[in-house]
Amino acid sequence: MESWQAPDLKRLGGQAVPLRLYDTARQAVHATEPHPDGARMYVCGITPYDATHLGHAATMVTFDVINRVWRDNGHDVAYVQNVTDVDEPLFERAERDGEDWVVLGMRETALFREDMEALSIIPPKAYVGAVESMPTIAALVERLVDAGAAYTVDDGTGDVYFPVTATEGFGSESHYDRDTMLRFFGERGGDPDRSGKRDPLDALLWRGEREGEPSWESRLGRGRPGWHIECAAIALAHLGDRIDVNGGGNDLIFPHHEFSAAHAEAATKAVPFAKHYVHAGMIGLDGEKMSKSRGNLVFVSRLRADGVDPAVIRLALLDGHYREDRPWTAELHAAAADRLARWREAMGMSSGASGTTTAQRVRERLSDDLDTPGALRAVDEWAAASLTGAHHDAHAPALVRDTVESLLGVTLLRAVFRQRTTSATTLDRSR
C-alpha cells in the first residue's frame, strides 16, 4: 500500500541524547536500546471509515517524534503501520451510506495520507493493509492452531478463538484485573457473551464465512480474521519476532495490544514481543474523549480546509505530554498560532541567542520520555531572548530552525498542501 511523501530531514550536529520511554508493561521509564541493525517500531493505524480526527493525529505525532529522536541518535528506523481495511465499523458505515466498503476504505485512507503529509509525519517504511496481508494473517492463525494455541467453536460457524491460557504472561502488558478486562473487552470490539467459548475473554482469530460478508480462503475454511491477529501477523512479517516499540492510543492497551502480543508470543515463543509498549493519551472536546460514537470529532482535514496551518495543529498537539489525556480547545489552538508566529519571527532574524544551548535542551527534553512541553519552552525562551535584539549569534536562527523542524517536526516555512478534488463529500460531516 502506498504511504506518503517524506518531509525533508536535516542531520543535526552536536551530541544526540539516547531516548528513554515509559513502558506500559513495566510501568516505568526505561532506556530504549535498539538493535545495532536498527530500531523496529509498529504502530496501529486507522480503520478507514471516517476522516482523521485530532485523536489520531496526536497518536501519529507522538510516534513520529520517537522516530525523529531515534534517527537523531543515528538509528535506522524500520517503522511499520497497518490499515485495518476489513472490519465491522467499516462495513457498518458503508451499509449506512449505501457505499461499497472497499471504496469507502480507499477514500478515507487516501485522506489520512494527505493529513499525515500535511502534518510532516515521516511515513512508515511499510504501510500495510489487512486485505493485502490476508495470506500472511491466515497462515499465522493456522500456525496457532497447529501449536494448540487456538480452538474452533463447536457450533458449525467455523469460528476460531485464541484462549487466554495460551500464554503464561497474559495480562502483563495491561495489568488490568479481570473485571476491567471484561468491561473493556465488551466495549472495544470483543464478544464476552459469545456462547461456546472456553472463556469470555477468548479472542476471535478467524470468523467463518457468513452470507453477505467478505471472506478469504484458508486451510481452516473461508472466512476473515479477527482484529488482533491482523496486527500480530503484519508486525511479525515485516519486523521479526521481537520489536522495540509497539504503539498506539491508550484505548488499545486492552484488548488490542494485550492480545496481539499474546498471539505473537504464542506463535514464536519470543517474550516479550515488544521491549516497550507505548501509549498516547486521548484528545477530548467539551470534557469528553473525542470519538466517532460521540460525534464530537475535530477533523484534521476540516481544519486544513478552513485554512489552519498544519504546523499550528502539530504545535498544539505537542503542547501536552503525550501520555496525558488532554482537551482540544480554542485557547490551545490560538496559543499554538501565537507561538508559531513568534518562532517564525525570531528565526527570520539575522542573529539570536545561543542556538547550541537551545538545540541541546530540546534534545534533552525529548529524550526524557518525550517531554515535548519542555522542548517547546526551550524554544520559547530562545525566541523571547532573540527578539530583544540583544544577542548576536549569527548561526543561531538557522540552527534552532533545523532543530525544530528535524526533532519536533514543525515546519517553519509555510507549505501549501494539496486538497483532493473529491474532498467536499468527505469533509461534510453534518450528515
From Swiss-Prot:
The EC number(s) this enzyme carries: 6.3.1.13
GO molecular function: ATP binding; cysteine-glucosaminylinositol ligase activity; cysteine-tRNA ligase activity; zinc ion binding
Motif placement: 'ERGGDP' region: 187-192
Regions annotated as coiled coil: none
Domain of life: Bacteria
Reported function: Catalyzes the ATP-dependent condensation of GlcN-Ins and L-cysteine to form L-Cys-GlcN-Ins.
Protein family per UniProt: Belongs to the class-I aminoacyl-tRNA synthetase family. MshC subfamily.
Subunit relationships: Monomer.
Name used for this protein in its record: L-cysteine:1D-myo-inositol 2-amino-2-deoxy-alpha-D-glucopyranoside ligase
Organism name: Stackebrandtia nassauensis (strain DSM 44728 / CIP 108903 / NRRL B-16338 / NBRC 102104 / LLR-40K-21)
Gene symbol of the encoding locus: mshC
